[in-house]
Amino acid sequence: MVKNGSHLDAETLAMLQNKAISITLPVVYTMVAIISIPGNFFSLWVLCWHIKPKTPSVIFMINLSITDLLLACCFPFQIFYHIQRNHWIFGKTLCSLVTVMFYSNMYSSILTMTCISIERYMGVVYPMKLIKWRRKRYALGACVIMWIFLLLAFYPLESTDLTYEVKELGIITCFDVLKWEMLPNFAAWVAFLLTLFVVLFLIPFIVTVGCYIGTIRKLIQTSSRYGNKQKTRSIYLAIIVLSVFITCFAPNNFILLAHMIVRLFYEGSLYPAYKLTLCLSCLNNCIDPFIYYFASKEFYQKFMQVFRPKVPLSDSLETRRESLFSGRTMSVRSMSSGPMDGLEGVKICLQRQESVF
């Protein structure tokens, strides 16, 4: 962070010349791109063309997969930038676009995983009481609102020239040196950073943890209804999502908060550590397909058909239990409502054939 007319401090100059960062980031981004691009293309293919009907969870997973692929489009620019020792040659407009997409991916992934956890919680703990909220149009609306909110939150990055010419090194940086004028005053900087940390990370993390604890507790209490296989898949899903939060997202967000506190109040810097934690935040692109694997029974079945075709697919007792449960639910809805309500209940319960787990 630099003010008009001031020179970069020694710590920032040292960070821009740090060989560990210039080597580590391109290597990690390349590996993530190699793994995540085919994985997310396969996921998108399965989710869009092989899973019907499109339940709320599927809508959220499609949103997550598209977000991951958009981030993959940013990797070539980031890789070239760091190979060139933090020298940006693509202009200020592309710098802003790549930066916004890079950070939108992380926070969109966080919010989408939170939406999936809420949808799972409603489907397991309150399957009938909250069924009207588990509809496709609400999931689509949530995705649209999510992206509008993110674009508004990152408006300072969208409307500011994020490039900076470092005359001492003869390079032009992209986002590595922020201009103080990006926001009007000190209070605006504090509000911006707290929004990123509290609203886009801390609150979603707490909600996600609470939803999965409630979901797993309910599954354990009603294991005879859902079956051990579905309970196990739900537990695996919870473990993977929480691991992504703790491993991929938490280090970056906590280091960012600590760095900005040190920068704003003590004129120090934790930016090298922050840059390295960006590698961790990108790893979620490789992990997301595993979330789909455990979140959707149909995705799991398609995966097995493609990669393990000789293994017979059989849901046996688990499928019969789920079908029996869906049938009971449908009957109750039909008998307790009017004619149109009964038809709506049948339609909704048919959607339950796509596993709520």
UniProtKB/Swiss-Prot annotation:
Alphabetized UniProt keyword annotations: Cell membrane, Disulfide bond, G-protein coupled receptor, Glycoprotein, Membrane, Receptor, Transducer, Transmembrane, Transmembrane helix
Segments on the Cytoplasmic side according to the record's topology features: 48-56, 119-137, 207-236, 295-357
Residue pairs linked by disulfide bridges in the UniProt entry: C95-C174
One cellular component (GO) term of this entry: plasma membrane
UniProt-listed GO biological process terms: blood coagulation; G protein-coupled receptor signaling pathway; Rho-activating G protein-coupled receptor signaling pathway
One function term, GO molecular function aspect: G protein-coupled receptor activity
Residue ranges crossing the lipid bilayer per the database entry: 27-47, 57-77, 98-118, 138-158, 186-206, 237-257, 272-294
Annotated membrane topology: Multi-pass membrane protein
PROSITE patterns for this protein: G_PROTEIN_RECEP_F1_1 (PS00237), G_PROTEIN_RECEP_F1_2 (PS50262)
Localization: Cell membrane
UniProt-annotated glycosylation sites, renumbered to this chain: N4
Extracellular-side segments: 1-26, 78-97, 159-185, 258-271
Pfam families associated with the record: 7tm_1
Main location: membrane
Domain of life according to the entry: Eukaryota
Homology family: Belongs to the G-protein coupled receptor 1 family.
Function comment: Probable receptor for purines coupled to G-proteins.
PANTHER family assigned: G-PROTEIN COUPLED RECEPTOR, P2Y PURINOCEPTOR 8
Protein known as: P2Y purinoceptor 8
Source lineage: Eukaryota, Metazoa, Chordata, Craniata, Vertebrata
Primary gene name: P2RY8
